[in-house]
Amino acid sequence: MAYSGFQFGAFNPQMGDGRAMLLGEVEKDGRLWDLHAKGTGLTPFSRLGSDGRGTLSSMLREYLISEAMHALGVPTTRALAVISTGRPIQRGHVQPAGIVVRVAASHIRVGTFHLAAQTDYTRQLADYAIARHYPGADYQEFFTQVMDAQIRTVSHWMRLGFIHGVMNTDNTTISGETIDY
C-alpha cells in the first residue's frame, strides 16, 4: 500500500511502498488479516534509482524483532516467513537479497491517509478503515480510537525500553501495530 508523509521533519509525497506489496486478505476466526511481502522488487511506487529489494539480513531482523515483540505482548506485525531470493544485492557491500512475508490486522498507515489526501480519496480510505477496524465509529471516534491504539502500543514500547528508530507517519499503522523494524 502506497503512502507519503513526514520524515525527518519534512513532507515527502512519495515514501513508499516501493519495495512491498499487499498480497491479499485472509479471514481467520471472523477477522481479516493482511498478507504482505516486503523486498519484492520494483513497484509502481518505487523511487527513482531504487531496486525495490531488501537484504536478507534486514528481513531476518524484521522477523526476529517482530516475533520477540509479539512474545512480549506488544501489538505488532507478525512474520510468516523469510525467503532468500538467491540473488545478490549491493548495499555498501554485496550481500544476499531476501523477502519477508508478514501478516497484520492492517498495513494502513497514517501516511496512507497523507497520500489519499493528495488524491481526494481520504473519505473512501477512512470509510474502509472504519468498516474494517472500528465498525460503527464516526470520523471523530475513528481518530480517537486510532490515537488510543497507538498510545497503547507506545506505552508497551516504553515498558520495555524499546525505541522505534524511525518513528514517523510511515511507520505508524491505524490499527496500532508496530511495523517496519
Regions found by a protein language model. Give the residues of each.
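Acidic/polar, glycine-anchored loop/turn motif associated with catalytic or activation segments
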Residues: 28, 145-146
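Catalytic activation segment of kinase domains across protein kinase-like and atypical kinase folds
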Residues: 94-97, 159-164, 168-181
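Phosphate/ATP-binding catalytic cores across multiple sugar-kinase/actin-like superfamilies
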Residues: 146-160
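Conserved ATP-binding subdomain of kinase catalytic cores across diverse folds
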Residues: 1-137, 152-153, 174-177
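Membrane-interfacial amphipathic/re-entrant helices at transmembrane-helix boundaries
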Residues: 137-144
